[in-house]
């Protein structure tokens, strides 16, 4: 593996208009945590950041409907989402929000820097209003036929079928999603990102991307064929104010949510540094001319957000850094790194249907965690999630994976290995002085080889293959125990051999536990302790209530100390370390849960 001192894990920002369901976390949450945990275990200095995305039309419209302010709505769901992600054990160095003073300042700095460099321009365009109310009609609440692919339910800002960004006036047969009326289009002044002026630098950058998933790279390059200037402000009262003379005080114009949300990766890194006591520490992951010039950055999101991470965000970074056809000078933050890798997952469906809160085709993370263990969901996402193809979550398949693989495979190996050693020796047994057999050596070698194989696959974002390789070690160890049958070695003369077999089995349990720690951290900590280990093996995040650094109201963040924990290596077990009879690590689920959960879906 390449030696990397600093690694940025930038995770898509969940929108703060409701609790998260398992489809959300399958695409960005769990995969990013697996990657970050592995990288830390391998010795890298990881900064994993994200937060709740709290601006934009949907929140304002929902708040109006509920009779609350947008801030009150965002506050509510920020806390819910923080609790959801904490329950899954996602190890954010900082999970914050976009309504902080720090975020506003960073967004406005990038806006001003790009404006000075000529990559943000003002122009008059056509905006939609409701004929019946006279109010601005948000583009997200206009629906019609996509002019590019013909999809009949395209939104006014983006087509979910072909992924292209749109303007409401581009749609054929546009209708308001609020009341079904045809919008009226009137002139309005807005600021635009001059994407064509950045097409050259984007193309050169994309040509240097190696190891990207083919669909992501192909889609991104296709977007460059017809880049158009994109509006980055909206007729809206809720959002980041425009930081230019004559615009700051206006209450009817705000920076578009997609512009401010992607800047969150940078603002969260800066906030983390400020909170850590070293305000310039963020530069170790971001500064293209300084300490972060060789720092790789990995961005995690669902496929519907590829355009924002492979075109829009790189364009903002390049424009602010003074690159592109207009040239210019970097702003006060300096030249900033463009993404190293954009890791896009496909979609997770549920029982053959698209997730939908309104149609009750959903299971929220908080509800799942009330009934099942976090590692059961993390395991399903790792082995059967939407890494490279759309995947269907069914309760029958979840039950099978949990009972047949997690419980009967991994859980069985842990339980019987430790049980036999505790019963017959009360501790980690010694190896027979006569030495190891070929079977012993072979199994130990298989486990040791897993550190290279599994680690390399996680590093390349091939997590399905990675956990598959780790579970092969588990299967080999179960086969070894069945063939060696230590329970049959009952005589005094056989006791040294029994001890050797159980020592080898326990060593492989320890190694396999380390290999599975990025995927199954909750159970990994338990298994570490069952093996007589002490201290933190798999660190967990904590929720902290913090004050806004720039004078705003307090809010909860996810953070943690992840400098402790297991290393990515085989650690020899200490002979004589006491062992107690183990309790089952994983819960076997009753088949009746399938019908129970399907009944819940049916309402």
Curated annotation (Swiss-Prot):
A motif ('HIGH' region) lies at residues 14-24. One of its GO terms (biological process) is methionyl-tRNA aminoacylation. InterPro entries: Anticodon_Met, Met-tRNA_ligase_1, Met-tRNA_synth, Methionyl/Leucyl_tRNA_Synth, MetRS_core, MetRS_Zn, Rossmann-like_a/b/a_fold, tRNAsynth_Ia_anticodon-bd. Zn(2+) binds at residues 146, 149, 159, 162. One of its GO terms (molecular function) is ATP binding. Binds 1 zinc ion per subunit. GO terms for cellular component: cytosol. It catalyses: tRNA(Met) + L-methionine + ATP = L-methionyl-tRNA(Met) + AMP + diphosphate. Keywords: Aminoacyl-tRNA synthetase, ATP-binding, Cytoplasm, Ligase, Metal-binding, Nucleotide-binding, Protein biosynthesis, Zinc. Its main location: cytoplasm. Belongs to the class-I aminoacyl-tRNA synthetase family. MetG type 1 subfamily. This is Methionine--tRNA ligase. It comes from Salinispora tropica (strain ATCC BAA-916 / DSM 44818 / JCM 13857 / NBRC 105044 / CNB-440).
């Amino acid at each position: 593996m390449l030696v990397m001192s600093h690694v940025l894990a930038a995770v898509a920002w969940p929108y703060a208009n409701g609790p998260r369901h398992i489809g959300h976390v399958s695409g960005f949450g769990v995969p990013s945590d697996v990657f970050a945990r592995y990288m830390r275990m391998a010795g890298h200095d990881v900064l994993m950041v994200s937060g709740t995305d709290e601006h934009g039309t949907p929140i304002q419209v929902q708040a109006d409907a509920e009779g609350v302010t947008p801030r009150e709505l965002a506050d509510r769901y920020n806390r819910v989402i923080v609790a959801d992600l904490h329950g899954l054990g996602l190890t954010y160095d900082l999970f914050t929000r976009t309504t902080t003073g720090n975020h506003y300042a960073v967004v406005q700095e990038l806006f001003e820097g790009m404006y000075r460099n000529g990559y943000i321009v003002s122009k008059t365009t056509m905006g939609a209003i409701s004929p019946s109310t006279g109010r601005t009609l948000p583009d997200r609440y206009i629906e019609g036929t996509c002019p590019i692919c013909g999809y009949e339910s395209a939104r006014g800002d983006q087509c979910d079928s072909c992924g292209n960004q749109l303007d409401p006036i581009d749609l054929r047969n546009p209708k308001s999603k609020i009341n079904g009326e045809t919008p009226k289009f009137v002139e309005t002044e807005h600021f635009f990102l001059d994407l064509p002026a950045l097409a050259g630098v984007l193309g050169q950058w994309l040509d240097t991307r190696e190891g990207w998933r083919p669909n992501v790279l192909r889609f991104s390059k296709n977007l460059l064929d017809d880049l158009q200037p994109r509006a980055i402000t909206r007729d809206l009262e809720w959002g980041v104010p425009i930081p230019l003379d004559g615009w700051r005080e206006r209450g009817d114009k705000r920076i578009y949510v997609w512009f401010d949300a992607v800047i969150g990766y940078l603002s969260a890194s800066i906030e983390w540094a400020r909170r850590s006591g070293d305000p310039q520490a963020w530069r170790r992951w971001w500064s293209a001319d300084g300490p972060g010039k060789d720092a790789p950055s990995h961005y995690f999101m669902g496929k519907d957000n590829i355009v924002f991470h492979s075109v829009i965000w790189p364009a903002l970074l390049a424009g602010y850094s003074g690159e592109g056809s207009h040239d210019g000078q970097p702003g006060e933050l300096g030249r900033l790194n463009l993404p190293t890798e954009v890791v896009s997952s496909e979609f997770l469906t549920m029982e053959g249907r698209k997730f939908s809160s309104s149609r009750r085709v959903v299971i929220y993370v908080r509800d799942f965690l009330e009934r099942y263990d976090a590692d059961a969901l993390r395991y399903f996402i790792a082995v059967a999630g939407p890494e490279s193809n759309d995947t269907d979550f069914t309760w029958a398949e979840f039950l099978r994976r949990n009972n047949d693989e997690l419980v009967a495979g991994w859980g069985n190996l842990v339980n019987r290995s430790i049980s036999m050693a505790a019963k017959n020796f009360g501790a980690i047994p010694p190896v027979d002085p006569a030495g190891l057999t070929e079977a012993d050596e072979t199994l130990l070698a298989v486990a040791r080889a897993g550190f290279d194989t599994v680690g390399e696959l996680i590093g390349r974002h091939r997590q399905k293959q990675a956990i598959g390789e780790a579970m092969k070690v588990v299967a080999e160890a179960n086969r070894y125990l069945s063939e060696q049958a230590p329970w049959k070695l009952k005589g005094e003369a056989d006791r040294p051999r029994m001890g050797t077999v159980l020592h080898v089995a326990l060593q492989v349990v320890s190694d396999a536990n380390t290999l599975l720690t990025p995927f199954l951290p909750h159970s990994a900590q338990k298994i570490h302790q069952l093996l007589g280990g002490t201290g933190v093996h798999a660190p967990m995040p904590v929720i902290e209530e913090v004050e806004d650094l720039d004078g705003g109201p307090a809010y909860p963040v996810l953070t943690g100390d992840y400098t402790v924990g297991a290393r990515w290596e085989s650690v020899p077990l200490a002979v004589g370390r006491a062992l107690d009879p183990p309790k089952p690590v994983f819960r076997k689920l009753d088949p009746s849960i399938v019908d129970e959960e399907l009944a819940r879906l049916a309402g």
